[in-house]
């Protein structure tokens, strides 16, 4: 939600599938798969597209190596300055002042990301220059839509172990379903699903309208026109809950 991954993670997914099958899945094909709400992990999404295409499946660890080579173009745990992969092509969707504004509006914030920790830390700490941002990344909790990571983050951000308001901003059906599952797991809190279309779906296009309808049908409470629109929403949603507010971002 804070970076455009259409030219990085999604491109690595496409390239990985093409590497094994010779078939390059179209962006709409990936959107449709993500719309099922089950394929938040791009390694698993790559394997699923290969399975549906009828390609013999590689070992998962081999596919992960291929995917990581496309995405990082170097050792994920090494010097980011040496990375030559698609990660270098990730336009930011927000700047540091986005988080300052959330602070000013009375919202604590953190991140629940399906990205590998080196990727998440790179964008948060080096590109956005955030200092030790609260983060649940891949491997820290089960993959979404399991709500464990979101619940854990809310426990860190809210001043009380029960109660409070949590808004989660995401751009996939899995993100929306994570909020719905959190409501079941922790009914003592108010959980709000804010959703936004990924930037490769242009405003006014039929594809974007269809995608937003998927998010609504999945249970999103509000569709925002952009990530930055969350600032105005958070200003209008300040309030009265003395037990605190937490904004979690994909």
State where each predicted segment sits.
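Active-site neighborhood of HAD-like aspartate-dependent phosphohydrolases
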Residues: 1-31, 44
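Helix-loop "lid/cap" segments that line or gate small-molecule binding pockets
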Residues: 14-20, 43-58, 153
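Short, surface-exposed acidic
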Residues: 21-34, 54-69, 74, 130-134, ...
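Short, acidic loop-to-helix structural element flanking the phosphoryl-transfer center
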Residues: 70-111, 115-125, 147
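Substrate-recognition "cap/lid" segment bordering the active-site pocket of phosphatases
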Residues: 110, 115-167, 173-191
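Acidic, Mg2+-coordinating phosphoryl-transfer loop and its flanking beta/alpha structural elements
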Residues: 168-222
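Short acidic-hydrophobic, aromatic-tinged amphipathic segments that line or gate anion-handling sites
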Residues: 221-230
